[in-house]
UniProtKB/Swiss-Prot annotation:
Compartments (UniProt record): Secreted
Post-translational modification (record): Proteolytically cleaved by aureolysin (aur). This cleavage leads to the activation of SspA.
Species annotation: Staphylococcus aureus (strain COL)
Record-linked PROSITE patterns: V8_HIS, V8_SER
Name this polypeptide is given: Glutamyl endopeptidase
Annotated family: Belongs to the peptidase S1B family.
Positions of the catalytic residues: H119, D161, S237
Length: 336
């Protein structure tokens, strides 16, 4: 199947398996630094605030299929109050490549971190600085939380179309996760087929940099694969999939025309990858008392209040505990 192209204002939308991107020859020149599948760290420093690219001659770019999947359920509506609640971390992305400017979506999940798709970051051709992010963008002239420049990319080691992008602080020395509250991730313990969901992002068939929400239900769920019956188009790649609690349960990648749209489901493997690479990512159950990852959980071995923790003064095996049976312990009344 060949891709189809949609005109968006004076930009164009080009098809990807998982997204349609917008191209404009007005893109800035990129550096020639190379980057493979391994993350490349650049010096963290304040960056000049990027701006949303506008206009440019139409320049279609066919790369992959299945970007625009409009299903019978086409319940999409625009979000105008983009800075409110769980909408705030939803992010408009532009990638400034030598061949043009491409658009996609993402979601802020940490102080300096955003999630999107592998195929979105692939458009940088190895230069993280080519990727710009505009959290809570309202339109191409109004992005209330400014813009940020990427400095490091880490691709998911599994098959899922998922990538982590870290950003430099802006000119005011603010991080992307400080100008908006990062999204809360679901632990997905209760996620199942037929549940109501939304996909929120920046579709390419709508006015540039306008946020839209699509509503539907989960139709399939297995491993890292999630499918649903709602409609999306190119530009939605990297959009967060929210449950009814407004927690992120997956990252949208695209779909198959007349069949389904899909996302990388945040299962245990994906969750472990995210926790290993994003220190401050927040999952909904992290602060629950029975969560073994909660430092306040008395059963957490790293919790000093855990009776089995060697550094717990109440632990009889603690050498500083006067009740310690160690006869060499000067604090032990039975010591010689």
């Amino acid at each position: 199947m060949k891709g189809k192209f949609l005109k968006v204002s004076s930009l164009f939308v080009a098809t990807l398996t998982t997204a349609t991107l917008v191209s404009s020859p007005a893109a800035n020149a990129l550096s020639s630094k190379a980057m493979d599948n391994h993350p490349q760290q650049t010096q963290s420093s304040k960056q000049q605030t990027p701006k949303i690219q506008k206009g440019g001659n139409l320049k279609p770019l066919e790369q992959r299929e299945h970007a625009n999947v409009i299903l019978p359920n086409n319940d999409r509506h625009q979000i105008t109050d983009t800075t409110n609640g769980h909408y705030a971390p939803v992010t408009y992305i532009q990638v400034e490549a030598p061949t043009g400017t491409f658009i996609a979506s993402g979601v802020v999940v940490g102080k300096d971190t955003l999630l999107t798709n592998k195929h979105v970051v692939d458009a940088t051709h190895g230069d993280p600085h080519a990727l710009k992010a505009f959290p809570s963008a309202i339109n191409q002239d109004n992005y209330p939380n400014g813009g940020f420049t990427a400095e490091q990319i880490t691709k998911y080691s599994g098959e899922g179309d998922l990538a982590i992008v870290k950003f430099s602080p802006n000119e005011q020395n603010k991080h992307i996760g400080e100008v908006v509250k990062p999204a809360t991730m679901s632990n997905n313990a209760e996620t199942q087929v037929n549940q109501n969901i939304t996909v929120t992002g920046y579709p390419g068939d709508k006015p540039v940099a306008t946020m839209w929400e699509s509503k539907g239900k989960i139709t399939y769920l297995k491993g890292e694969a999630m499918q649903y019956d709602l409609s999306t188009t190119g530009g939605n790649s990297g959009s967060p999939v929210f449950n009814e609690k407004n927690e992120v349960i997956g990252i949208h990648w695209g779909g198959v025309p007349n069949e389904f749209n899909g996302a990388v489901f945040i299962n245990e493997n994906v969750r472990n990858f995210l926790k290993q690479n994003i220190e401050d990512i927040h999952f909904a159950n992290d602060d629950q008392p029975n969560n073994p990852d909660n430092p306040d959980n008395p059963n957490n071995p790293d919790n000093p209040n855990n009776p089995d923790e060697p550094n717990n003064p109440d632990n009889p095996n603690n050498p500083d505990n006067p009740d310690n049976g160690d006869t060499n312990n000067s604090d032990n009344p039975d010591a010689a």
